[in-house]
Amino acid sequence: MSTEHKQSLSAVTLAAIGVVYGDIGTSPLYTLRECFSGHYGFDVRPDVVFGFLSLIFWMLILVVSVKYLTYVMRADNAGEGGILTLMSLAGRNTSSRATSILVVLGLIGGSFFYGEVVITPAISVMSAIEGLEIAAPALDPYIVPCSIAVLTLLFVIQKHGTGSVGKLFAPVMLVWFLTLALLGLRSIIANPEVLAALNPKWAISFFVEYKSVSFFALGAVVLAITGVEALYADMGHFGKFPIRLAWFTVVLPSLVLNYFGQGALLLKNPEAIKNPFFLLAPDWALIPLLILATLATVIASQAVISGVFSLTRQAVRLGYLPPMRIIHTSEMESGQIYIPVINWTLYLAVVLVIIGFERSSNLAAAYGIAVTGTMVITSILFCTVAWKNWHWNRFLVAFLLMVLLIIDIPMFSANVLKLFSGGWLPLSLGLVMFIIMTTWKSERFSLLRRMHEHSNSLEAMIASLEKSPPVRVPGTAVYMSRAMNVIPFALLHNLKHNKVLHERVVLLTMRTDDVPYVHNVERVTIEQLSPTFWRVVARYGWRETPNVAEIFHRCGLEGLSCQMMETSFFMSHESLILTKRPWHLFLRGKLFIALSRNALRAPDQFEIPPNRVIELGTQVEI
């Protein structure tokens, strides 16, 4: 291996530590404390401590190391991962009915992420700042205001991008993980018998001894693996090997040492359960640890915010959310984006959650149901990909699915039992996003079908216009067309009302392919339909933002020269009229109209100069 390659691998692995593992890396702040919370009624006794530690350790091994790093990360689309990517892969070789079911599952998983993303910044930052209780108990009333202040600053700087400060994320998180390891190791050395919990018999004995109560406790243990989806979702940014390398060399050892260090502390001093993480540190280190923990939770929150921006862009490009303003905050990195409406909606939700729940321990009950629900869906989608796309033996796939669900379903069920103590929050938020995504997709499809169902043949119309041409005016006209073989509404209305046509007409169709990126060579396809009509199809991946200036540049290279300031862009603007429907479809129609009115207009989507755009209105019944 060359020196340059080693340096590159080290840099990417370090970057992965800073971004991918922020959420799961801050779980030691609250996980073990919540295992012994009053909800479950466990006393801090050695057999219970060993049981919880064994469960946490084997959860990290089976769910993170085996399920995600070994199996799920094999399913990639040109290197990209994530729940919507997995949904897309799973539906490629299935029947239309099965595909519909898989799409619904994928959208539910994506919706769960939106529910989870509201909780992660709140619980992470609050749990860090709650260290004030240990360092200075008199500051307890300021935990909520301080948490809101920290997160306000984080959301405000989003519009400026995180490129400059982002370089500090990896070193800070590396220091964080090393600190986790050192704090835990210090406590383990003082009480090494805690390492007996590595034996899975303690987890089994825990279930045998405490029976039904231990099942409820799974709802707390699962806090140790929140953020596991980030490993798969961020695969496209860092690659599989650096993410795996970071986990096995730095993250996993640090987490295990810290959890077991907290356990060793509890064996020695059961009173430390009020905050075992911060009580691991000597008195002189409390303030530095509090600052480091706050920085780590802010970085974890930033990773989640960036993740929701990426998921939203993917959903918009795949047609599951309405177009919205997406701002690129870096000229070098296409993945660094900012979506104002998502940013401030998320900020408002996070602040309301902090004010409403007040303590991270209250919020812990809400955390987990979205994570485990997504895990169940991921298992089903992955096994579908293994069976249909990779042609694995169906009995092997069935066995694998059974094993995965034996782990996933009990954890999900245990969290469902927390529905009325906080679990309703991510479910409610997820339900709202699911309704929005399914409404936009289905109503948009119905609208386009209604608009084109009475449309004449494009070829026949062009032949008619060439045979009996209307008055021609100099210049080029571009008509945006959603479908390749359909007459654009704007063209029909221009002929109907103005009775003129430009000397050169370009029918431009934007296509989103089921890949993250499309090579520039394949970006544009040009077809001359007649002496004065051209069809241009521009292809983009769901990680890319369409740009008309780039399309014109590619057209020029292909022999079709178009100058932006000498071209008129004709677009149709639909005024939607709601017809009589059943009450539930009526409400969905109202939601669709509201989403349409607030969607980003096409000229802004494609960065077309406003003074080159002509919009022609049309009324459409839906």
Swiss-Prot record:
Disulfide bonds: none annotated. One of its GO terms (molecular function) is potassium ion transmembrane transporter activity. It is a multi-pass membrane protein. The chain crosses the membrane at residues 9-29, 46-66, 101-121, 137-157, 165-185, 213-233, 247-267, 276-296, 337-357, 363-383, 395-415, 416-436. This is Low affinity potassium transport system protein Kup. NCBIfam families: kup, PRK10745.1. The gene is kup. InterPro entries: K+_transporter (IPR003855), K_trans_C (IPR053952), K_trans_N (IPR053951), Kup (IPR023051). GO terms for cellular component: plasma membrane. It comes from the Bacteria. Responsible for the low-affinity transport of potassium into the cell. Likely operates as a K(+):H(+) symporter. Belongs to the HAK/KUP transporter (TC 2.A.72) family. Keywords: Cell inner membrane, Cell membrane, Ion transport, Membrane, Potassium, Potassium transport, Symport, Transmembrane, Transmembrane helix, Transport. It comes from Yersinia pseudotuberculosis serotype O:1b (strain IP 31758). Its main location: membrane. The keyword Transmembrane applies. HAMAP family: Kup. It catalyses: K(+)(in) + H(+)(in) = K(+)(out) + H(+)(out). It is found in: Cell inner membrane. Coiled coil: none annotated.
